[in-house]
């Protein structure tokens, strides 16, 4: 079963574009919950995602309720600096589960009510107190690759796939 990145009302097109590229490169599904803080025609969104958009498994939703209704049965983790558990302490290794990593708006995060109702599934990435938060696209990549690492990288190519040879065999 696949891994999923869920963006709740993302505001910065470059972040969403970068995340889409990570999703294309890791075979991770991308879910966007409206309203978005930008147009999907935004040049920053397109530039950050480069020409990989055709390889992104992308779904849109008009609300959190619609998202949860259409993805019932998944295992949901809410990524927040307030999480009581560290992301790397969770087991994502079961290939038969759908793991959903839910991220909030860049400026305000996820709704407090959602976090309070799911306290045990709220995860954080350790950081210093010198910053308010980590960048959304970097955080999404950390979670995507941690899940894939635990799944032995699934179907990803684990050998270089380029014609260019740098190292001697």
Swiss-Prot record:
Q: Where in the cell is it found?
A: Cytoplasm
Sorted alphabetically, the keyword list is:
Cytoplasm, Methyltransferase, S-adenosyl-L-methionine, Transferase, tRNA processing
GO-annotated cellular components: cytoplasm
Q: Which GO terms describe its molecular function?
A: RNA binding; tRNA (5-carboxymethylaminomethyluridine(34)-2'-O)-methyltransferase activity; tRNA (cytidine(34)-2'-O)-methyltransferase activity
The record's listing under Pfam families reads: SpoU_methylase
Q: At which positions is S-adenosyl-L-methionine bound?
A: 79, 104, 125, 133
E.C. number: 2.1.1.207
Gene3D superfamilies listed in its UniProt record: 3.40.1280.10
What InterPro entries does the entry give?
Alpha/beta_knot_MTases (IPR029028), SpoU_MeTrfase (IPR001537), TrmL (IPR016914), tRNA_m1G_MTases_N (IPR029026)
One of its GO biological process terms is: wobble position ribose methylation
Which reaction is catalysed here? cytidine(34) in tRNA + S-adenosyl-L-methionine = 2'-O-methylcytidine(34) in tRNA + S-adenosyl-L-homocysteine + H(+); 5-carboxymethylaminomethyluridine(34) in tRNA(Leu) + S-adenosyl-L-methionine = 5-carboxymethylaminomethyl-2'-O-methyluridine(34) in tRNA(Leu) + S-adenosyl-L-homocysteine + H(+)
SUPFAM superfamilies reported in the protein's UniProt record: alpha/beta knot
Entry's family note: Belongs to the class IV-like SAM-binding methyltransferase superfamily. RNA methyltransferase TrmH family. TrmL subfamily.
Entry-linked PANTHER family: TRNA (CYTIDINE(34)-2'-O)-METHYLTRANSFERASE
Q: What does this protein do?
A: Could methylate the ribose at the nucleotide 34 wobble position in tRNA.
Protein name, UniProt field: Putative tRNA (cytidine(34)-2'-O)-methyltransferase
